UniProtKB/Swiss-Prot annotation:
Residues 1-21 form the signal peptide. It comes from Conus litteratus. Residues 22-40 form a propeptide. The keyword Disulfide bond applies. One of its GO terms (molecular function) is toxin activity. Expressed by the venom duct. The cysteine framework is XXVIII (C-C-C-CC-C-C-C-C-C). It is found in: Secreted. This is Conotoxin Lt28.3. Keywords: Disulfide bond, Neurotoxin, Secreted, Signal, Toxin. Belongs to the conotoxin D superfamily. Contains 5 disulfide bonds. Probable neurotoxin. GO terms for cellular component: extracellular region.
């Protein structure tokens, strides 16, 4: 097979991995994956009842539900973090 025909065949097949049965796949968001990986390394869950709130032993602020352990308020059914200053 000549090189031109081979290249056209590859260019025809290549986009198929980006198309799902229901349409184009959503774009990959690296920022969310980086934040999730960082939270797994630096934060931990306060209780099984509130897996959506994370507190950190380090003084952090504004990291998608991650705040310093000493300012996490877990008195009651849910944990909350104060707003960042």
């Amino acid at each position: 097979m000549p090189k031109l025909e081979m290249m056209l065949l590859v260019l025809l097949i290549l986009p198929l991995c980006y198309i799902d049965a229901v349409g184009p796949l959503p774009p990959w968001n690296m920022e969310d994956e980086i934040i999730e990986h960082w939270q797994k390394l630096h934060c931990y869950e306060i209780s099984d009842l509130t897996p959506w709130i994370l507190c950190s032993p380090e003084p952090l602020c504004g990291g998608k539900g991650c705040c310093a352990q000493e300012v996490c308020d877990c008195s009651g059914p849910a944990c909350t973090c104060p707003p960042c200053l």
